[in-house]
Curated annotation (Swiss-Prot):
This is Serine hydroxymethyltransferase. The keyword Metal-binding does not apply. Pathway: One-carbon metabolism; tetrahydrofolate interconversion; Amino-acid biosynthesis; glycine biosynthesis; glycine from L-serine: step 1/1. Keywords: Amino-acid biosynthesis, Cytoplasm, One-carbon metabolism, Pyridoxal phosphate, Transferase. Gene3D superfamilies: Aspartate Aminotransferase, domain 1, Type I PLP-dependent aspartate aminotransferase-like (Major domain). GO terms for biological process: glycine biosynthetic process from serine; tetrahydrofolate interconversion. It comes from Psychrobacter sp. (strain PRwf-1).
Length: 418
């Protein structure tokens, strides 16, 4: 039976949910900064026969037989990742960014060691020392933030906390910070206290690969990233290092320390996305991502909304709604009703709970993949402000929804759906 089974015939409930999600992606504008649309080739690799193969270990050193072809797949992914980011070492097995990060902790630290990372409400990530995450539960996590007046990373605070707490590892990187990070300053601070420098570049990896955002690889001991977001690949993880002497520790931390068998279909999809990112048109795409973000930020600021740190130099922006006495939860709902998907997000010193928040985060990778240019991005920013200004007025929502549907029809995600 299973040899000729189809989801449509065998599981109509699941099939309908999948079809509905396809329609949602085609008919909504995606502005969640961590989401993107991967290519048909990436999806082809991820849906391949490779999903059937177990391959514990690494190329040439497996615990299972029949790995001669998946060895080729994984080595292609490794070699392309190293070429793309100028690294001496790459591990393509982490199932996700969080798994990559936990492997770094396992490789470089002992339980209870002190780490210094960006706080969640300043734009950091759960795995950078948040008290509800393994990084804050199993380790002594100290958190740095932003300069209140500018919204920029408070490097003086980073240095002061490093001198005071002597962390074994300093974490740089972010999930909601829109400016350029000074990797050299972080390196200098880490060296001053003998700490490892670990950079999580998950949000800007595609920009880094294209050379439109400074690379942390020459400065950090270890770099991790997801492979979706700006990199436009499958939902998965990657570890890089300029120091191949760390290879054994990192490899052992991934397998057997943190994971069992690698997902060979996902690794194949990563190999495809790395090849795509090595092409000239990928640089053009990333340049447009930043242009679109800047165009949106300009309109949003002109309409009276505050962007934390004063603007954007990458693909995202964090909009504070404190002055408008509006919650991120409300804004998320209103925009969603208009066909525009964003996410509520905490802002620095947010008085609201993480389930409510006082801000929204938006990003341009997905709309740029779709084909938006600066003028269209600016128009979209205006629609967002119209919805927020109206506080969810039904007529404004309906008018905006009609505009969204029109441009989505003009710029489909995948031509197969036409």
């Amino acid at each position: 039976m299973f040899k000729d089974i189809s989801i449509k015939d065998y599981d109509p409930d699941l099939y309908q949910a999948m079809v509905s999600e396809t329609k949602r992606q085609e008919s909504h504008i995606e502005l969640i900064a961590s989401e993107n649309y991967c290519s048909q080739a990436v999806m082809e690799a991820q849906g391949s026969d490779l999903t059937n193969k177990y391959a514990e270990g690494y190329p040439g050193k497996r615990y299972y037989g029949g790995c001669e072809y998946v060895d080729i797949v994984e080595q292609l992914a490794i070699d392309r990742a190293k070429e793309l980011f100028g690294a001496e070492y790459a591990n393509v097995q982490p199932h996700a960014g969080s798994q990559a990060n936990s492997a770094v902790f396992l490789a470089l630290l002992e339980a209870g060691d002190t780490v210094l990372g960006m706080s969640l409400d300043a734009g950091g990530h759960l795995t950078h020392g948040a008290h509800v995450n393994f990084s804050g539960i199993n380790y002594n996590a100290v958190q740095y933030g932003l300069v209140e007046e500018t919204g920029l990373i408070d490097y003086d605070e980073v240095e002061r906390l490093a001198q005071e707490h002597k962390p074994k590892m300093i974490i740089a990187g972010f999930s909601a910070y829109s400016q350029v990070v000074d990797w050299q300053r972080f390196r200098d601070i880490a060296d001053s206290v003998g700490a490892y420098l670990f950079v999580d570049m998950a949000h800007v990896a595609g920009l880094v690969a294209a050379g439109v955002y400074p690379s942390p690889v020459p400065f950090a001991d270890v770099v991790t990233t997801t492979t979706h977001k700006t990199l436009r690949g499958p939902r998965s993880g990657l570890i890089l290092s300029r120091d191949d002497k760390l290879a054994k520790k990192l490899n052992s931390a991934v397998f057997p320390g943190n994971q069992g068998g690698p997902l060979m279909h996902a690794i194949a999809a990563k190999a495809v996305c790395f090849k795509e990112a090595l092409q000239d048109d990928f640089k053009t795409y990333q340049q447009q991502v930043v242009k679109n973000a800047k165009a949106m930020a300009k309109v949003i600021q002109e309409r009276g909304y505050e962007i934390i740190s004063g603007g954007t130099e990458n693909h995202l922006m964090l909009i504070s709604l404190v002055k408008q006495e509006m919650t991120g939860k409300e804004a998320d709902k209103w925009l969603g009703d208009a066909g525009i998907t964003v996410n509520k997000n905490a802002v620095p010193n947010d008085p609201k709970s993480p389930f409510v928040t006082s801000g929204i985060r938006i990003g341009t990778p997905a709309i740029t993949t779709r084909g938006f240019n600066e003028a269209q991005a600016a128009d979209l920013a205006g629609w967002i402000c119209d919805v927020l200004d109206s506080r969810g007025d039904e007529k404004v929502l309906a008018d905006t929804r009609a505009k969204v549907e029109k441009i989505c029809a003009e710029l489909p995600v995948y031509e197969r759906n036409q």
